Amino acid sequence: MLSGPLRWAIILIGAAIALNYIDRGAVSVAAPLIKDEFGLTNERYGVIVSSFYWTYVPALALAGWLADKISVRLLMALGVATWALATIGMGFVGTGVAGGVTGLLLLRLIMGLGEGVAFPCGSKLIARVPEGARGLANISLSGGLALGPLIGTLAGGAIMQLWGWREMFIVFGLATLVWLVPWWLARRGIEEGEGRHDDAPGNAAPLAPARLVDVLRQPAFWAVTLLHLSGTFALYFIVGWLPLWLVKARGFSIIDMTLLTSVFYIAQIAGGTLGAWAIDRAIRRGGNGSMWRRRMLFASVSACVVGLLLLPDIQGWVPLITLIAMTGFGYGPVPNLLFVIGQTMAGPASAGRWVGVQTSIGNLSGIIGPVMTGIIVDAAGYRPAFIVTAAIVGLGTLIFGLAVRRIEPVRWAPA
């Protein structure tokens, strides 16, 4: 069972992840307006989206190493403050204060640097949660990952209708700064999650984290990382291109686009929560955690792939909503499983660096995907982009399934 302070710290991590995705995804919500105002092609828009990941990817690896070395409380606060201020700055792009397209690029780079702390810090705290509760605890990460775009899409669409896209960035950034107050006050739960009290009388000495070189030598690490790479490719395709596809290719209004996009995120939250609950329940009843997680992964990805393949040709509101919901529900358990698998195989002492590097390499799809998709859309339209995305997530899952037969802790050699 989780103590009250640790549970509160994990809830705050989930809120930070939601804010993380609200702020980074705001550029996609505003994409139809930003593209028109700055005259961006699909390829150049893809570069703007991709620029975030140029700093986010190395920041994840650095934060994973730092999370095993210094206070998660301080590291998280510094990162959140950095990305919140960058988000506010996005609201001044093109006004003479923050420049135009160059300002967009620079602020996205700063935002990526700050946002890199969230997942390694969250995994560091959650790795100490008992296995039978770890799935639902990870909903704070994967649920925030879906809740953020949902809130960002709905609230962002409303703010843009009332005031404009610049005001949307300012409101989102200010809301993120407010989060720092409860986080800084949650010291006890954060320290418990870090294992600061494991060396109290009667407790065994805390384990030293595995060396980074030992993590990188593990074939299982690379299989999980490939799975992460393919899974995030699918997510970033949805986050970055579903709104544009609905407006530019299907002719929906901004309001209709926000409602349809929100269907994906609502279904993602439902699928992720139900999947985590089912796995945790099976484990508490004596089920094999490795077997249940593998089954859930294959079933979820299959539903997501089918949805991606059928979406480009679907006609009518009801079939469109149904397919978007199926794709989101299928994708829902995937992010949760990515983190649970990494935390389980790394162990509590090494979860920060394992998940940090795993997430760092996995998010290379954020650099490659938006630009590649932009080139495909400019050259051949949206349908091939959906097909390529489905193929990538399906292939990554297949390779993982063949390479990792059991999801269990790695036996690290003594340092």
Mark where each language-model region is.
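Juxtamembrane intracellular "pre-TM" segments in multi-pass secondary transporters
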Residues: M1-L2, E191-V224
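Central cavity-lining transmembrane alpha-helices of secondary-active solute carriers
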Residues: S50-W65, S262-G275
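C-terminal ends and interior cores of transmembrane alpha-helices
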Residues: A81-A98, S302-Q315
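Cytoplasmic helix-loop-helix junction between adjacent transmembrane helices
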Residues: L105-A146
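Helix-loop-helix hairpin linking two adjacent transmembrane segments in secondary transporters
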Residues: L141-E191
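C-terminal transmembrane helical hairpin of 12-TM major facilitator-type secondary transporters
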Residues: S290-L338
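A late C-terminal transmembrane helix in Major Facilitator Superfamily
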Residues: Q343-A379
